[in-house]
Every structure is written in C-alpha cells, then in structure tokens.
Amino acid sequence: MAATPEFGSLRSDDDHWDIVSSVGYTALLVAGWRALHAVGPQPLVRDEYAKYFITASRDPYLMNLLANPGTSLNETAFPRLYGVQTRFFDDFFSSAGDTGIRQAVIVAAGLDSRAYRLKWPNGATVFEIDLPKVLEFKARVLAEQGAIPNAGRSEVAADLRADWPRALKAAGFDPQRSSAWSVEGLLPYLTNDAQSALFTRIGELCAPGSRIAVGALGSRLDRKQLAALEATHPGVNISGDVDFSALTYEPKTDSAQWLAAHGWAVEPVRNTLELQTSYGMTPPDVDVQMDSFMHSQYITATR
C-alpha cells in the first residue's frame, strides 16, 4: 500500500492552477456536488449554472456523476453538505444587503455564481477574486449560457499570496464603504501564516459595519478517513481521485478566535449539523459521522 502523502505535499509557495488541475479541480468538484444537490430531493439551493461548468470541463468522472446521480443518503452526503454551505453563504449576503451593504467580496471565488443566482439590491457590486485561468473559464462558460449578473460584477484576477488588495481597489472597491466578505472553502489550502495574512488584509480593507462569513474546518477528510467512512457508509465517497491531504495544510489557528482577537464581533459559531437543523433538516447518520471527522465551523462577524 502506498504511503499517505504528507499535508501539502502537492503544493509549493508559487504554484498556480487552472480549473482541471491541483486546487482548481476542487472548485470543479464542488461545482459538481452543487449540481447534484440541485437535482436531489428537497435541495436547499439550486445552482442552475453548476452543471454547465462540468459539461464544459469534459471531466469524465464528474460528467458520469451527473449522468448517473446517486439517490441514497450516503451517495448524496457530499452534495448535501455543500448545499448547506452554499445556503449559509447565500443567506449571509442577502442579510448583508438588507443592512445596506453594497460591496460584496468573494475571496477565492472559484466557480461561484452568486452574482447571477442571488437577488442583489440596487447599486450592489460583487467582486470575485481568483486566479486568472479560473476566472477566464467561468466567464467563458457563463457567457456561452447567456447568463446576466443581477448586480455589478467585477473580476479581480489575483493570487491571494500576492498584493491582491491593490488589485481589488483598482477594480473599484472602496475601503471607505462597508463591505461583506465570504471566505468559503479556502482556508484548508492556506498555511497558518497565509491565513493570518489574509484575515489581516481583509480587516485593513473593512470600514465600520463591514461583515465577514467564514467556512472553516478543524480537520479534513484524508484518504484513510474517507476509506473508513466508505466502509461503513457505502457510496459516500464521490470525490474521485482527489487527495485533499496532499493539497491542503495542517489545521491552524481557530478562525473565530483570531477574528475576535482582532477587532471583530463574532456571532455564535455553528457547524453543519446545527445549520441543517435550522433549515428544518434532520441530519442522517452519515452526515453526523462526516462532521465528526471534519469539525466544521460556520462563522459570521461584524467589524
């Protein structure tokens, strides 16, 4: 049996990717799970654009998943988990808009389509930060579908390890006005120092009244954990050949504690199971077991 790769073994300080390689492929995988959730029973959200990204990628594994969607509680676990996550961030931006915030920043936007899916208030602008190749792929696919955003949309092609605040401001972001920020699915792919730098830079760009939502994990499902979960819950592992441990870094400073110590008023932290309950769902055993590995945290805070 091959040895389990060390955390971050497929990463380097200056690595880059497109949508079908390295970290970029995880965005495609999550889009596939959102597409599956949209056609599943009682979806929390319907991302009607997600399926088009899979088709455009021509990835055989994901195309097969969409052509033959599983229906059991085990087979729909990952799509359900990401349905919960998507709903959380959707609600966050809707709530921020209700408070008068008109600048939304999606950090490491990947294949997020909220600028197109959500109803945004008049005058709202959605800033999407990600690597150029990821943004180019998304723009091409959405243009092919004739998609029109429901808010002003500004692409910020930048590496989060570089001077992305300069690029954000050049794209029209005004740090003197309040803003709402999402950090969704990103933190496992950052080192502890990079995570602290990200939060520091966000804080420096936030006027009073700004808000942030963070999805964090206390740990990640590595291949051994997925294999163990698959043994007790057949069909749950629909992540293909992705080895998350080799793409991500070890657990780091607690995000809620960091924010609270740096000027943010942090609301009570919830996990996936608590969110499911708040959405009127009863978490099945497979979801409970999955979260016992991942220790999910959903955080909201105000500046």
Swiss-Prot record:
S-adenosyl-L-methionine binds at residues 130, 159-160. Its EC number is 2.1.1.-. Keywords: Methyltransferase, S-adenosyl-L-methionine, Transferase. It is an enzyme of class 2 (transferase). One of its GO terms (molecular function) is methyltransferase activity. One of its GO terms (biological process) is methylation. It comes from the Bacteria. PANTHER family: S-ADENOSYL-L-METHIONINE-DEPENDENT METHYLTRANSFERASE YKTD-RELATED (PTHR43619), S-ADENOSYL-L-METHIONINE-DEPENDENT METHYLTRANSFERASES SUPERFAMILY PROTEIN (PTHR43619:SF2). Exhibits S-adenosyl-L-methionine-dependent methyltransferase activity. The lineage of its organism: Bacteria, Bacillati, Actinomycetota, Actinomycetes, Mycobacteriales. Belongs to the UPF0677 family. This is Putative S-adenosyl-L-methionine-dependent methyltransferase ML2020. The keyword Transferase applies.
